[in-house]
Each structure stands twice: as C-alpha cells, then as structure tokens.
Amino acid sequence: MVNSCCGSVCSDQGCGLENCCRPSYCQTTCCRTTCCRPSCCVSSCCRPQCCQTTCCRTTCCHPSCCVSSCCRPQCCQSVCCQPTCCRPQCCQTTCCRTTCCRPSCCRPQCCQSVCCQPTCCCPSYCVSSCCRPQCCQTTCCRTTCCRPSCCVSRCYRPHCGQSLCC
C-alpha cells in the first residue's frame, strides 16, 4: 500500500500521508505541508509550502523557497537575501553589519563606524557619519568629510583647509 501511494505515480490523496515522507518520494506532486520533514529536504522537493525550520537546509535554498520563515544563515544566498540573512552577498539597506562591509554594500545608510573601511570610501558615500581616519582618502576628502578625526596628512586638501582641520 505504501509503494502504490508513494511511488512515481503518486496520487493527490495518498501523497500527504506521514508514512509516505521519504526522500525517494519527494516529488513536485508529493511535496506538501504534511510532508515537510528533514528526510524530505531534497532539492527536487523545495517548494514554498515546505519552507520550514526543519526543511531549511543548504540543499533547499532555492529562489522559490525564499520566504521569511525559511531564511536561515545556512540558506543565505544571493537569491535569498532577507533582513535575517546578513551576509556579504546579501548587502542590503537592512543588512549593514560588520560582516557586510564590502564595496558592493557601500550605501550612505551603511556608513557606520563599524562599516567604514577603506573599501567603502567612495565619493558618493562621503557622509558625515562615515568620516573616520581609515576613510580619509583622496576620493573621500570633501567639505562634508572635514572632521577632526579625519585630519591626517594624506587627507589634507585645499577644500579641507578649515579651522577644524588645521
């Protein structure tokens, strides 16, 4: 009875049974909410309705499985970038963290003391909150970035020659 209901010819009625949850039976027609078990987490079974904490694995990180309930660190891929998925490849406005300080993630709202690195000192990201000594470069030395903490020799330019930067 199990083979007839869980085989390659899965019927819609018998596919949701608990005794039918096997990796070999995880097909598109057999992947249901009642069949989302860890043993059923294979790439061919990754569907939105199966995105649960027990089924969110590295082999189940597909674009169709990118829902908020399935966004776990092991599923952090470029196709699954959510606020709870802060990784370098997931650099978004809600993902400004120390582990996300990459050139592709340099946003004005990401200019924080923890994310202000030489790789993040671009002209368009020269905001006052990002003025740090390690960001004092020729491309980041502007009038809005002339702070005492940014007064180093390599950053001293004519347009930074103000009283606070002398």
Curated annotation (Swiss-Prot):
Task: Spell out the GO cellular component terms annotated for this protein, sorted alphabetically and separated by semicolons.
Answer: cytosol; keratin filament
Which regions does the record annotate with the repeat sequence? 5-9, 20-24, 30-34, 35-39, 40-44, 45-49, 50-54, 55-59, 60-64, 65-69, 70-74, 75-79, 80-84, 85-89, 90-94, 95-99, 100-104, 105-109, 110-114, 115-119, 120-124, 130-134, 135-139, 140-144, 145-149, 150-154
Keyword annotations for this protein?
Answer: Keratin, Repeat
Question: Where in this chain does the entry annotate a coiled-coil region?
Answer: none
Tissue note: Expressed in the hair follicles.
One Pfam family linked to the record: Keratin_B2_2
Region entry 26 X 5 AA repeats of C-C-[GRQVCH]-[SPT]-[VSTQR], spans = 5-154
Give the InterPro entries listed for this entry.
KAP
Function noted in UniProt? In the hair cortex, hair keratin intermediate filaments are embedded in an interfilamentous matrix, consisting of hair keratin-associated proteins (KRTAP), which are essential for the formation of a rigid and resistant hair shaft through their extensive disulfide bond cross-linking with abundant cysteine residues of hair keratins. The matrix proteins include the high-sulfur and high-glycine-tyrosine keratins.
Q: How does it assemble?
A: Interacts with hair keratins.
PANTHER family reported for this sequence = KERATIN ASSOCIATED PROTEIN, KERATIN-ASSOCIATED PROTEIN 4-6
Q: Which family does it belong to?
A: Belongs to the KRTAP type 4 family.
Know the name of this protein?
Answer: Keratin-associated protein 4-4
